[in-house]
Amino acid sequence: MAGNSIGQHFRVTTFGESHGIALGCIVDGCPPGLEISEADLQTDLDRRRPGTSRYTTQRREPDEVKILSGVFEGKTTGTSIGLLIENTDQRSKDYSDIKDKFRPGHADYTYHQKYGIRDYRGGGRSSARETAMRVAAGAIAKKYLKQEFGVEIRAYLSQMGDVAIDKVDWNEIENNPFFCPDVDKVEAFDQLIRDLKKEGDSIGAKIQVVATNVPVGLGEPVFDRLDADIAHALMSINAVKGVEIGDGFDVVSQKGSQHRDTLSPQGFGSNHAGGILGGISTGQDIVANIALKPTSSITVPGDTINVDGESTQLITKGRHDPCVGIRAVPIAEAMLAIVVMDHLLRHRGQNHGVSTQTPKI
């Protein structure tokens, strides 16, 4: 079956293609009474929006979201929320050269083999343009989580190529176009992007996303563990090739005496687990990292084949991001918010009223 939906109680279904008429989504399960407006959603959409800086694609889309249903007099009604964003800056002619060719490193070949037909304009459904609707839906989840439970979800670019941050200042993230929390690395990121543009090449990136004030108890063992669903959601983001929860792959070189998060009446002694044990939230910060590959949409010639299986070469035309990780920051926030929101509603539905004698630390 088609995989266009995520979540069970808070369910998001998206539709639309990169060069289609519009993008849209349906959000089911949002509790009634939440004050929400298009302006609330637009804030995060503007952070993801293309054409806002010289470091990202110059496709200029206003990404103005319209709320079509599920909101009355400024509040959610508990019914399906319909959202729509019209595409306004398509340049389909930029992709005429790849109509019968497969871009190496993209979904062209696999979509063609799976469906027997593909929308070659900007990648069609496989384009990261689709993630605009995830961000819009995630903004609803973020507002509910923050307003009702004090849960805050934030992310930042922690590495681009070989340039990695040394410190995290949350106040700096929105002060630069890289969502970088280390002001001393902004210039290095800038230089890297300028060099890549001269070379016609691209680079990978790493993003950390954190949820704070998450209640203890979220997650549904065994198959719907919280960390499993987070990994699923983050892995579904375009270009993501790796997901870590907590210390992630660093645990390979750790000993049990180092990795275990000891407990005391004052709380946990560390957070190597990333806020999740046994697939259930501990009440600590949920910490995840994602690795994004360098986009293959570059002007460096590459070998490929056409639809007849014949060898050919391809130089990608169009407007593309030298580092897709930059605009993926609000997308990572949105996907984590959707998962936490879904699990919070699921937990409340089954375990509301559950209490123990053990104090929460």
From Swiss-Prot:
It catalyses: 5-O-(1-carboxyvinyl)-3-phosphoshikimate = chorismate + phosphate. GO terms for biological process: amino acid biosynthetic process; aromatic amino acid family biosynthetic process; chorismate biosynthetic process. It comes from the Bacteria. CDD domains: Chorismate_synthase. FMN binds at R125, S126, S127, N238, A239, G278, K293, P294, T295, S296, S297, R319. Its EC number is 4.2.3.5. It is an enzyme of class 4 (lyase). PANTHER family: CHORISMATE SYNTHASE. Belongs to the chorismate synthase family. NCBIfam families: aroC, PRK05382.1. This is Chorismate synthase.
